[in-house]
Structure formats: structure tokens, C-alpha cells
């Protein structure tokens, strides 16, 4: 299958640059994957499309302020790190720019010297392995010195760090937010629970690989990045109970979808499990775990538009995206939402 089959024209002004004042006031497109029928609504009305006995599966990862701006210890030259993956207590895999300044053995200073980094090695994808030196707790140092690593297509500075977190974010480890969850408020989640819909939490730490473009023209040749996930015994049991009783499993976001499809058996039952997933879902994939998906509007030719095309049908998705552009829906991380059922 060709990458170009997932291309669509997107005017730049439709790329949302900041979140709306009220999380739940974003627009909602409802796509029926069987009939291709489309409805338009507001996210706070999502309860109209849920039924008692359904189960929403949400990703409770928390974004860390993974972007660090510092200087080279000897020359003072500016450097930017983005933390990707913790390897051990003090060692991380990072992205760095400019790369020419980050030679093995070189050291960098952040803040007033509260954090020092030494380059240990290079990675296959042009990143680096670094060791950090600091006093106290690393997370506290990072919270003081780091910035939120908002996606490259967002040019405005984020006024409030919390708006790039879901209201239920709990476990630190992501370099990007699971953005489908940004639309939920505490009040809306409570309303959903009161109508007899379960909310179950799993964890997948989102890596920056989620923004990595597909470079292969034949998409089957694309190598997917790895992300760490945790599905607890309690979460697996709750989801499996819903499956047994005939309720629908609705994944909130592509990250929840990736996790559930990774740990599901052939009958769609979920196992308690943790580990790394590099699952790549594109048209032709047979879904085992989910009956519905809440997601944002994704980049042309991205692995995410390929995943939603696998779930709803490529023709349905490309037509829905064309309508979304015509109706001026807001796209990407701070944009509007789609419910596929």
C-alpha cells in the first residue's frame, strides 16, 4: 500500500495552535464505520453516543517537561535536548540539536549548573545516550528546568503546562500527550460514569516517534517506534467483563488502541501485561480488542491516519477528512475530535 494514498490537502490555518478555553467545547465528528454516515456535534455531548454497559479505556500517562535548553560546558554553544527514553536511573536516550555539538565525551550545563549531561554514545536514528549529574530527585530538577515538548507544528508558546496534560494524567513518562484525552473534563467523566459507562485506565508512555514521518513509499516497509505500556490485572478484568456482557470497548486515542491490540488474545480478551510495543496498524489489520475509538484529526501520511483508516475503512476516513477540512474542523494535538463507532 502506498503512503501517498493517505495524503490530503490541509490549509495551515486549520492546525490548532492552542487549546480551547473549555476542553469539552471542541467539535466532535461522529463516523459510523459500517455505513460511513457522518454527524457533527460538540464533545461535551459525547454521552449521546455512549450506552450503559460500554467501557471507555483511557491512557493515564503524564507528559514530562522533556525539552531542555542548555549550553556546552567548554564553548558555551547553545544545545537543545529532548528526552526520549530512560535507560537506567541517570542514563537517557535523547534527541539533540545541533547534533554537531554533541560529540561523545562532551558535557553540557543546564540552568545554573543544577543539571550536567555527558554524551556517552550515539544511536542508530541520530540520537544520543547521555548520563545526567545532579543533586536530589531527577524529576524535581527536570520540572524546574524542562519545558513541555509540544509538537513541531505548534508554533505558539504554551501558556499553561497543564493544558498539555489530560485531567487524569498520573504516571510520568511521555514525551507527548495522548491528545484524544485532552477533551475530557472531570465533570464530563463523572457524567459518563453516572450513565453506567465504565472508565478504565491503562498506561502507554508516548514517544516522539509518534511524530516521525513515514519515509517509505510502500508503508509496509516502515519501521515503527517502540513505546512502553502497562495493563494492570484490574484494568484487564474490567475490560473483559464488558466484553463478556456484550458492552462496547471504546479506546480513547490511538495510544490506548495500540496498547489494547498489543495485549489482546484472538478472542479480544485482554491480558495483564507490561512491556514494549512496536505494533504498526494499517489497512488490512484485523482488530481484536476494540469496538470504537475517540481520536483527533491526524497528519497526512502519518501512521495515525493509517491506523484510523484500518479501523473505519480508508475511503470512509479520507472522505471524513475532506469534510472536516471543508467544515473547518481544527486539526492535530489541540484540535477537534472524532468518534468512530
UniProtKB/Swiss-Prot annotation:
Alphabetical keyword list:
Cytoplasm, Queuosine biosynthesis, S-adenosyl-L-methionine, Transferase
GO terms for biological process, alphabetical = queuosine biosynthetic process; tRNA wobble guanine modification
Q: Does the keyword S-adenosyl-L-methionine apply?
A: yes
Enzyme Commission (EC) number: 2.4.99.17
Top-rank taxon, per record: Bacteria
Question: What does the record give as the reaction this protein catalyses?
Answer: 7-aminomethyl-7-carbaguanosine(34) in tRNA + S-adenosyl-L-methionine = epoxyqueuosine(34) in tRNA + adenine + L-methionine + 2 H(+)
State the compartments where it is located. Cytoplasm
CC per GO annotation: cytoplasm
Molecular functions per Gene Ontology? S-adenosylmethionine:tRNA ribosyltransferase-isomerase activity
Query: Which pathway does this chain act in?
Result: tRNA modification; tRNA-queuosine biosynthesis
Question: Which InterPro entries does the UniProt entry name for this protein?
Answer: QueA, QueA_dom1, QueA_dom2, QueA_sf
Protein family per UniProt: Belongs to the QueA family.
Q: What functional role does this protein have?
A: Transfers and isomerizes the ribose moiety from AdoMet to the 7-aminomethyl group of 7-deazaguanine (preQ1-tRNA) to give epoxyqueuosine (oQ-tRNA).
Q: How does it assemble?
A: Monomer.
Q: What is this protein called?
A: S-adenosylmethionine:tRNA ribosyltransferase-isomerase
Organism per entry: Thermoanaerobacter sp. (strain X514)
- Gene giving rise to this polypeptide: queA
Amino acid at each position: 500500500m502506498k503512503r501517498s494514498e493517505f495524503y490530503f490537502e490541509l490549509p495551515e490555518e486549520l492546525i490548532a495552535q492552542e487549546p480551547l478555553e473549555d476542553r469539552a467545547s471542541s467539535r466532535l465528528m461522529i463516523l459510523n464505520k459500517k455505513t460511513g454516515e457522518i454527524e457533527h456535534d460538540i464533545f461535551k455531548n459525547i454521552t449521546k453516543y455512549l450506552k450503559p454497559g460500554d467501557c471507555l479505556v483511557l491512557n493515564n500517562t503524564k507528559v514530562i517537561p522533556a525539552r531542555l535548553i542548555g549550553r556546552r560546558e567548554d564553548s558555551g554553544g547553545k544545545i537543545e535536548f529532548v528526552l526520549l527514553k530512560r535507560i537506567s536511573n541517570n542514563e537517557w536516550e535523547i534527541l539533540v540539536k545541533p547534533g554537531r555539538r554533541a560529540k561523545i565525551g562532551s558535557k553540557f550545563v543546564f540552568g545554573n549548573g543544577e543539571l550536567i549531561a555527558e554524551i556517552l554514545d550515539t544511536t542508530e536514528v541520530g540520537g544520543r545516550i547521555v548520563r545526567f549529574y545532579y543533586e536530589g530527585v531527577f524529576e524535581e530538577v527536570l520540572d524546574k528546568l524542562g519545558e513541555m515538548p509540544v509538537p513541531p507544528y505548534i508554533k505558539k508558546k504554551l501558556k499553561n503546562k497543564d493544558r498539555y496534560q489530560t485531567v487524569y494524567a498520573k504516571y510520568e513518562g511521555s514525551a507527548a500527550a495522548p491528545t484524544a484525552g485532552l477533551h475530557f473534563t472531570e465533570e464530563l467523566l463523572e457524567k459518563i460514569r453516572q450513565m453506567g459507562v465504565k472508565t478504565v485506565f491503562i498506561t502507554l508512555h508516548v514517544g516522539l516517534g509518534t511524530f516521525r514521518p513515514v519515509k517509505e513509499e510502500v508503508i509496509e516497509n516502515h519501521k515503527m517506534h517502540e513505546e512502553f505500556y502497562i495493563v494492570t490485572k484490574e484494568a484487564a478484568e474490567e475490560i473483559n467483563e464488558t466484553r463478556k456482557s456484550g458492552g462496547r470497548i471504546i479506546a480513547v486515542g490511538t495510544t490506548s488502541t495500540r496498547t489494547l491490540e498489543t495485549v489482546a488474545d484472538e478472542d479480544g480478551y485482554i491480558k495483564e501485561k507490561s512491556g514494549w510495543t512496536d505494533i504498526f496498524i494499517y489497512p488490512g489489520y484485523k482488530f481484536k480488542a476494540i469496538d470504537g475509538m475517540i481520536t483527533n484529526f491526524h497528519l497526512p501520511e502519518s501512521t495515525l491516519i493509517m491506523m484510523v483508516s484500518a479501523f473505519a475503512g480508508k475511503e470512509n476516513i479520507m472522505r471524513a477528512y475532506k469534510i472536516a477540512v471543508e467544515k473547518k474542523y481544527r486539526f492535530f494535538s489541540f484540535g477537534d475530535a472524532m468518534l468512530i463507532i
